[in-house]
Design a protein with these regions (language model features):
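Conserved beta-strand segments of alpha/beta enzyme cores
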Residues: 9-11, 129-131, 165
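Catalytic helix-loop patch of NAD(P)-dependent Rossmann-fold dehydrogenases
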Residues: 44-62, 71, 80-133, 137, ...
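Residue(s) in the substrate-gating loop at a strand-loop-helix junction
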Residues: 77
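NAD(P)H-binding glycine-rich loop region in Rossmannoid oxidoreductase-like domains
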Residues: 10, 14-52, 66
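Hydrophobic pocket-lining residues that define ligand/cofactor binding sites across diverse proteins
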Residues: 64, 123, 158, 166
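Glycine-rich phosphate-binding loop and adjoining beta1-alpha1-beta2 segment
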Residues: 1-8
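Substrate-positioning beta->alpha
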Residues: 107-110, 118, 131-132, 143-156, ...
Length: 183
């Protein structure tokens, strides 16, 4: 909702994060949420998934450095935790589990982990004031009608008055975050 940005005097800059963003004006804050988000794309386009995450983050960190921003927030993912010990349901920020780097679906998780590392490196070497937020899978307004992730399937079933059908045995639990709750 662009009107919400304008109401607070914020300017939304739209561009392709795979290219450096030509911004002439001063920049105070950067909120970096650009990412490939569809699991199907992680598997069908793992190289592009990784490069979008890394190059996009690099370009925004360079912009933050050049403009000497007051702060930058990188929206990462709880997927950086990988597979953690099932005995510990309470995961801390320092609890990194296993991610198989050779599994193509890991392109998203590994890309996010590496981007967090890049943020830390820019903070250390160039003093870029960057913070990281690890979000659960986020959904909300603006999702494509063709979206096939579970929350979209459930929403479609609810809107049609149909039963919600699980395509698994139902034993897995997942965390979801509504967009406005993340903001």
């Amino acid at each position: 909702q662009l009107s919400a940005f304008l109401e607070y005097g914020l300017e939304l800059i739209v561009g392709d994060v795979l290219s450096p963003l030509p911004v002439e004006e001063p920049v105070d804050y950067i909120f970096h949420g650009a990412s490939v988000t569809a699991s199907k794309d992680f598997v069908e386009h793992p190289v592009e998934t990784i490069l979008t995450t890394l190059k996009g983050t690099e370009h925004l960190l360079e912009l933050a450095r050049e403009k000497q921003v007051r702060s930058m927030v990188y929206l990462s993912s709880m997927e950086v935790y990988g597979v953690v010990d099932p005995e510990h349901w309470n995961v801390k920020e320092t609890d990194y589990g296993y991610i198989d780097p050779l599994q193509v679906r890991s392109s998203y998780s590994e890309g996010k982990r590496m981007a967090e590392g890049l943020c830390g490196a820019y903070a250390h070497e160039y003093h870029v004031p960057v913070k990281t937020a690890r979000l659960a899978q986020t959904f909300g307004a603006g999702i494509s009608r063709q979206e096939n992730r579970v929350f979209a399937q459930m929403a479609r079933s609810i809107l049609k008055g149909e039963d919600i059908v699980l395509h698994t045995d139902g034993s897995k639990a997942h965390c979801y975050c509504y967009t406005s709750d993340a903001v």
